[in-house]
Amino acid sequence: MFLAQEIIRKKRNAETLSTEEIQFFVKGITNNTVSEGQIAALGMAVYFNDMNMDERIALTTAMRDSGTVLNWQSLDLNGPIIDKHSTGGVGDVISLMLGPMAAACGGYVPMISGRGLGHTGGTLDKFDAIPGYNTEPDSALFRKVVKEAGVAIIGQTGDLVPADKRFYSIRDNTATVESISLITASILSKKLAAGLDALAMDVKVGTGAFMPTYEASEELARSITAVANGAGTKTTALLTDMNQVLASCAGNALEVKEAVDFMTGAYRNPRLYEVTMGLCAEMLVLGGLASNESEARVKLNTVLDNGKAAEIFGRMVSGLGGPADFVENYSKYLPDSQIIRPVYADRSGFASAMDTRELGLAVVTLGGGRRKPGDALDYSVGLSKVCALGDEINPEQPIAFIHAQSESAFAEAEAAVKKAIHIGDSKPEKTPEIYRYIRESDL
């Protein structure tokens, strides 16, 4: 029998907690025998004194096991259960293509996603732009769509990881969100509760990233790779660039359009293509569906070019209640804003830097993101045809198009976009889309 206050005292004194102590505390978070004040105190103690890898693995697995852990064995699936998670960015529409692409190559992708947070867009918000699509199906429908389509992208259900829900809301209110140990456990407990065989982790770097510096992003990537593999799920983290909008657009319906165009081959943004392929290829290799990255890329290009990935996306959409002809006729179903107008730079030069976070906040201001949880969204608004770093710019050429519902919203977004996209005299050095891979063997 343990006492919550003794566990807090140990961590306050920078001692190591045992697996049993961590399990006891997490059980208390779940069944409310540990108070909000005690949870906040442990969060602050961990924030200042950190946890070693064994403690992080114990916290992650205890939180994973605080609710239902999905088990796919009864479905007799003939492929690995694989997934991807991103720390979030702007124009990060990868999940919409990656899930169907991986499924088309023989994987099964039960992707449990989230809504938008701060300046970053949420995968579920993009799907909510599709009429009829149910992001909260019951367990039977979720399993049915995973089995039949190979992929289902839905929201976190009430019985998955209840400990994280309570712990996260308290961390959010007590300034302990930024602990690498606690971020690792929060992300991985949710992902590993989906019963995964393998996971590719996309950790963003740059002005639109969740972590403030490259070093902090790398530290998080190393922690996630170590803890996930330690918890028994093959995992690789990729450090990817978020110093500019990843797709050509940002905004819910706009990103869905770009994702469908990507899968049908109508348009593939080269940066988006590189990061999507890097993550998806790693999933195939970790899941045993390809022996190396080049073989994985050949398979992925094949399912893009022969239409199989697009077909699977359509099957997932209709399986979860959306229109059966969505891929063919998406423009019929997705909303358009009242105003669609270009923004121009005030001078000639090169797009030399981008404050990606500010561009994400411009989408929030337009109504495409939340200022507080529970806010209703306007799925039609956002930015499209956003210029890329290194593009030559002149005052007659748009740096982006703004999709707004009112003149005042347009004017506010226009000022934000002009401020966020810096025009310089010289072309900036090209940054890689993927900075590095962190595999278990690199730790």
Curated annotation (Swiss-Prot):
It catalyses: thymidine + phosphate = 2-deoxy-alpha-D-ribose 1-phosphate + thymine. Pathway: Pyrimidine metabolism; dTMP biosynthesis via salvage pathway; dTMP from thymine: step 1/2. GO terms for cellular component: cytosol. Gene3D superfamilies: Nucleoside phosphorylase/phosphoribosyltransferase catalytic domain, Pyrimidine nucleoside phosphorylase-like, C-terminal domain, Transferase, Pyrimidine Nucleoside Phosphorylase, Chain C. Keywords: Glycosyltransferase, Transferase. Its EC number is 2.4.2.4. GO terms for molecular function: 1,4-alpha-oligoglucan phosphorylase activity; thymidine phosphorylase activity. SMART domains: PYNP_C. The keyword Cell division does not apply. PROSITE patterns: THYMID_PHOSPHORYLASE (PS00647). GO terms for biological process: pyrimidine nucleobase metabolic process; thymidine metabolic process. It holds the Pfam family PYNP_C. Belongs to the thymidine/pyrimidine-nucleoside phosphorylase family. Homodimer. The enzymes which catalyze the reversible phosphorolysis of pyrimidine nucleosides are involved in the degradation of these compounds and in their utilization as carbon and energy sources, or in the rescue of pyrimidine bases for nucleotide synthesis. PANTHER family: THYMIDINE PHOSPHORYLASE. This is Thymidine phosphorylase. It comes from Shewanella pealeana (strain ATCC 700345 / ANG-SQ1).
